[in-house]
Amino acid sequence: MIHYFSQTGNTKLLGDFLKDNINDSKTIYVGFWTDKGNANQEALDYLKTLHHQKIFLFGTAGFGKSEEYFKRIINKVKESIDSTNEVVGSFMCQGKMPDSVLQRYLSLKESDKAPKNIDLLIENYYEALNHPNEEDLENLGALNNRVL
C-alpha cells in the first residue's frame, strides 16, 4: 500500500515509481515533502494513525547535498510513528522547488537582509531543478529491493 503527500510533484514521482515497481503487500509506503526539517503535517497526521505496521518512508527535500540532513529529517519523522510500528526502510532525495523560492532568494540577495549563504541557496535551487531524476529513482528501487 502506498500513500504519499506531494505539493510540487516530486514525492508523487517517487510514489508512482514505487507503484509501478514494487509488489509488496506487507509494507505501507508513506511519502512526504519536507517542511521545516520534518514531513509535511498531512503525512505526520497519517503516520500517527498507523499501528502494528511495517513502514517504508520516502520523501523529498529542496536541499539535497547532505545525507546528514536527510537522516535528521527521517529521524524527526520517526518521532511521529507509534512504537508498535516497524520502520523497515527509508529514502530521501532532493526535489525541485517552486519558482517562488528563487524569487524570494533573488529579492533577499538585493536587500540588506541577505543571509551570508544566499549564493549557496540560489545555487542549490538550480541544482534541485534536476531532481528527482533517473538516478534518484534507481537508488530508490535498489534500496527498496535490499530492504525487502
Residue positions per predicted region:
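FMN-binding flavodoxin-like domain, especially the glycine-rich phosphate-binding loop
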Residues: M1, K19-V30, D35-L148
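N-terminal beta1-alpha1 ligand-phosphate binding loop
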Residues: M1-N21
